[in-house]
């Protein structure tokens, strides 16, 4: 293990050296810190029971790093070929030496202007990629994200907008809802060779076909993006999905971006998904499941406004209703704001207020969580997006669970309680 880690460190050091020796681009993201919880022990994250995201400020408990290296490998006129990569790490920030295997998040090649005469400005790409992801920064919620291994052509200039076509895959490894049979030989108690058929499990391959039409000018400083994603599951010959598995589904997305919006921007998003696309509601598909037949409706409004040269604010409103045929769906309500007051160009104070509610489809019961964070921050510039940043924070959260209570109590908490967290964190992107 030590040799493995040493070789990895040498490889990264070599790549870092290459950034100064050749035209290699080095980008990335990182966060880390230390925190304490009023109930004792290390910092704990405050997240609504049944929810998939949380308001981030003063509420992140892991060390997370993405290291991106890329280089233009070919350039001729307007044509160019770019190699991009991304290795990610995540540890619990508990001790000095925390060993973890890296995750290869991206490795792809992008050929810009590959068909300059026929498709000017279009890019042909293939490989693993973060593909045109859309998210709410405050709670790290990726509402449109089909990232994975794939291929496509993007930014085809149609004159009135840009068209992108892609296919990506997310495989369900050894999915429990996928079956086949193997003939197995064995020796019985009498020493005779016998045979029987045993059930086996195998992967389910979910392909997502993505069509996007972006940069549609619909009003002054306003642009519309329209997307359609179709997910379809398939298996190897000799295997089959469990009866009732969703197998396929689709998701439709409309996103309006308003620029020059009170000194910032506003995004309004409407999404509708069916069946296999309702498991995560992001654009990824889970066709092996028998528990995701149904539909989802989501509305999001988020952005940034600048009230004065001294004050900026992030905001987010989310409504998501998933109605499932088995009555196991949920409705998610979320609202948050993060105002920032700038004392000078490199020092600021931030407050984040976040509220999440999950309503159970079958019982109508609700789980709630509210949190407030006060943070003093030193950052590289006077924008709310300025990074790197070092922040000292205090966070107070209160929750009240009415269903799936054991998910909370099994983790050592009461169904209705509160917690105070304090700590120091840095965050950087470059």
Curated annotation (Swiss-Prot):
<protein>
    <recommendedName>
        <fullName>Maltoporin</fullName>
    </recommendedName>
</protein>
<keyword id="KW-0998">Cell outer membrane</keyword>
<keyword id="KW-0762">Sugar transport</keyword>
<keyword id="KW-0472">Membrane</keyword>
<feature type="signal peptide">
    <location>
        <begin position="1"/>
        <end position="23"/>
    </location>
</feature>
<comment type="similarity">
    <text>Belongs to the porin LamB (TC 1.B.3) family.</text>
</comment>
<keyword id="KW-0732">Signal</keyword>
<feature type="site" description="Greasy slide, important in sugar transport">
    <location>
        <position position="385"/>
    </location>
</feature>
<feature type="site" description="Greasy slide, important in sugar transport">
    <location>
        <position position="97"/>
    </location>
</feature>
<feature type="site" description="Greasy slide, important in sugar transport">
    <location>
        <position position="29"/>
    </location>
</feature>
<dbReference type="GO" id="GO:0042958">
    <property type="term" value="F:maltodextrin transmembrane transporter activity"/>
</dbReference>
<dbReference type="Pfam" id="PF02264">
    <property type="entry name" value="LamB"/>
</dbReference>
<dbReference type="GO" id="GO:0015481">
    <property type="term" value="F:maltose transporting porin activity"/>
</dbReference>
<keyword id="KW-0406">Ion transport</keyword>
<dbReference type="GO" id="GO:0009279">
    <property type="term" value="C:cell outer membrane"/>
</dbReference>
<keyword id="KW-0813">Transport</keyword>
<keyword id="KW-1134">Transmembrane beta strand</keyword>
<feature type="site" description="Greasy slide, important in sugar transport">
    <location>
        <position position="64"/>
    </location>
</feature>
<comment type="function">
    <text>Involved in the transport of maltose and maltodextrins.</text>
</comment>
<dbReference type="GO" id="GO:0046930">
    <property type="term" value="C:pore complex"/>
</dbReference>
<feature type="site" description="Important in sugar transport">
    <location>
        <position position="142"/>
    </location>
</feature>
<dbReference type="GO" id="GO:0006811">
    <property type="term" value="P:monoatomic ion transport"/>
</dbReference>
<feature type="site" description="Greasy slide, important in sugar transport">
    <location>
        <position position="265"/>
    </location>
</feature>
<dbReference type="InterPro" id="IPR036998">
    <property type="entry name" value="Porin_LamB_sf"/>
</dbReference>
<dbReference type="InterPro" id="IPR003192">
    <property type="entry name" value="Porin_LamB"/>
</dbReference>
<keyword id="KW-0626">Porin</keyword>
<comment type="subunit">
    <text>Homotrimer formed of three 18-stranded antiparallel beta-barrels, containing three independent channels.</text>
</comment>
<feature type="site" description="Greasy slide, important in sugar transport">
    <location>
        <position position="429"/>
    </location>
</feature>
<keyword id="KW-0812">Transmembrane</keyword>
<dbReference type="InterPro" id="IPR050286">
    <property type="entry name" value="G_neg_Bact_CarbUptk_Porin"/>
</dbReference>
<dbReference type="InterPro" id="IPR023738">
    <property type="entry name" value="Maltoporin"/>
</dbReference>
